[in-house]
Amino acid sequence: RTLAQSLADWGADVIIGTHPHVLQDAEWRTAADGRNVFVAYSLGNFLSTHSKPDQLIGAVLTLELEQTTEPDGSVHCAVRGPKLHVTVTHYDAGKSNVRTYLFRDYTPELAQAHGVRAAYPSFGYDYIRQTAQTYINSEFLELA
């Protein structure tokens, strides 16, 4: 969070974090010059064959950027309507037939057939929903 604040203060308008392989929260931060900066700390994995349930849940970020040019020539960029659309990497037994679904297109039946259930039988449709709701602020979360 310290690095995100520094990046905002240095002029970033949007910050998208990566690497931890799991979903992490998103928030607005206020830059030193008063701008609102959107930060998504991690979108998780979009496509992977990881073996742990939380590493199979990710998100796609959508947002609108609005650019304004002031009379003095300075340009400002504002972020509008950021949403994290939850994704699920699905694979069959033996990590075969790997594919990614938006959660809104995923079904409880697919979740029951997920290959990760061999090692983690608690993985399922409700688990995915609850995990996303745990990590992502409802202001930004898009499940439907």
Feature-to-residue mapping (PLM):
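A short C-terminal boundary segment appended to hydrolase-like catalytic domains
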Residues: 56-144
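Conserved beta-sheet core of the metallophosphoesterase superfamily
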Residues: 1-60
